[in-house]
Curated annotation (Swiss-Prot):
Record organism: Aromatoleum aromaticum (strain DSM 19018 / LMG 30748 / EbN1)
Family matches, as InterPro entries: Ribosomal_uL18_bac-type, Ribosomal_uL18_bac/euk
Keyword Transmembrane helix: no
Protein name as it appears in the record: Large ribosomal subunit protein uL18
Gene name per UniProt: rplR
Known partners and oligomeric status: Part of the 50S ribosomal subunit; part of the 5S rRNA/L5/L18/L25 subcomplex. Contacts the 5S and 23S rRNAs.
Sequence similarity: Belongs to the universal ribosomal protein uL18 family.
CDD domains: Ribosomal_L18_L5e
Source organism, top-level taxon: Bacteria
Gene Ontology cellular component list: cytosolic large ribosomal subunit
Pfam family, one: Ribosomal_L18p
Length: 117
C-alpha cells in the first residue's frame, strides 16, 4: 500500500466511527496549496457550512493558501459559519491526515471560534 491508500484506509475507519454516533462532523482536506473544511450533518448527506482558501475573500487576505496561517483563517471562518448554521458541537474528521501542522492549526482556530469537539 502506498501513502495515500494508508491515509484513506485510516479515514474510512474514522468516518465509520463518527457515522455510528450520528453526530455532525467537521471534515478537513488539504493539498499542498490549499486547505478545505466542511461541516456535514449526522446523516452525511448535507453540507451545513464550508470554508476554504480557494474562496476569493480568503485568498485576498493571504499570500499563500497552503500554510498554517491560512489554516487558522479557514478555521475561524468555518467556526463562524457553523455557528450561524446552528452548530455548536462537532466530531473532528481529519480525513486520515496527522493531527499536526495545518490540520492542528485549523482545529485550534475552530475551537477558539467557539466550536466544541
Amino acid at each position: 500500500m502506498n501513502k495515500k491508500e494508508v491515509r484513506l484506509r485510516r479515514a474510512r475507519k474514522t468516518r465509520a466511527k463518527i457515522a455510528e454516533l450520528k453526530s455532525v462532523r467537521l471534515t478537513v482536506f488539504r493539498t499542498n496549496s490549499h486547505i478545505y473544511a466542511q461541516v456535514i450533518d449526522g446523516s452525511g448527506s448535507r453540507v451545513l457550512a464550508a470554508a476554504s482558501t480557494v474562496e476569493a475573500d480568503v485568498r485576498s487576505q493571504l499570500p499563500n493558501g497552503g500554510n498554517k496561517q491560512a489554516a487558522q483563517v479557514v478555521g475561524k471562518l468555518i467556526a463562524e459559519r457553523a455557528k450561524a448554521a446552528g452548530v455548536e458541537a462537532v466530531a473532528f474528521d481529519r480525513a486520515g491526515f496527522q493531527y499536526h501542522g495545518r490540520v492542528k492549526a485549523l482545529a485550534e482556530a475552530a475551537r477558539e471560534g467557539g466550536l466544541k469537539f
